[in-house]
Amino acid sequence: MITEKQLIEIKHLQDECEKFEEINLKLNWEMLRNRKNDLKEDFFYYDKDQLVGFVATYYFGEKVEICGMVHPNFRRKGIFSNLLNEALNNLAPVSTILLNAPEVSKTAKEFIKKQENCTYSFSEYQMVWKEQELIEFTPIVNFTKAVQLDFAFISNLDVVCFGFEKNDAEKYNQRILNEPDRALYIIEVNNEKIGKLSLLRENNESWIYGFAILPEYQGKGYGKNALLQIIEKENKIGNEIHLEVALENSNAKKLYTGCGFRQYNTQDYYVIKR
């Protein structure tokens, strides 16, 4: 578990790093705030009483993502390399290790170039809905709060729509169902389950994750209708609306841009071989 003091220190360091390079770091704050197990997942480097380096690991079933940062005034001292090695040495058994870095971070690119065991894997767009006149629509899908009985359906969607391994999908969704700050919804048409999405609200932002529609129901307007309902609801409460989409998922990107989302950041992922 991370203490409240440590969370404040991490946020301050994040602000310094993002301001220096004009980047957006993906630190998965909902996971940092809800650390529960005994596994060592977060690694800190202090200069006297100041946090100047931080690396975190995030488990998604048999896959782990790693993200970190070092204060601009303390770079080129081996701090990130040491923290990354410490994180790698403390990993639970996993099948895939991914290092995450903002596409525009020159510091990250320089570091990764020097890593012989680091290979580019894929990218994700981070998108935001720009406040505008909402597209007119009539609700044709319904949302119900997911419960444990929906677990198999939800996990199967991640296998079918996102290429998850079954075990990874089950581990990931068990965590999502238990996260207090995130709501997981089933999307239905005529009482038939056709999709799902999760919604995380924090700091006047609403983040849409894991948005998926069964293939046999795609291309019928259900996904767009669901998205427009979420946009309308979150916009009414004054939240800025964000989501992420894989770079290669052109159909999803077309759907999001058609609903008013615009790309503002790209996150790159690199596989680390051990």
Task: Name every feature range the model reports, one short phrase each.
Residues 1-30, 137-166:
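Short amphipathic alpha-helix that is part of the acyltransferase structural core
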Residues 18-48, 163-198:
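Active-site rim helix/loop that mediates acceptor-substrate recognition in acyltransferases
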Residues 51-53, 121-123, 195, 223, ...:
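A structural microfeature
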Residues 66, 98-101, 208, 241-245:
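Conserved hydrophobic beta-strand within the GNAT/NAT acetyltransferase core sheet
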Residues 76-89, 210-215, 219-234, 253-258:
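Conserved acetyl-CoA-binding loop-helix of GNAT-fold acetyltransferases
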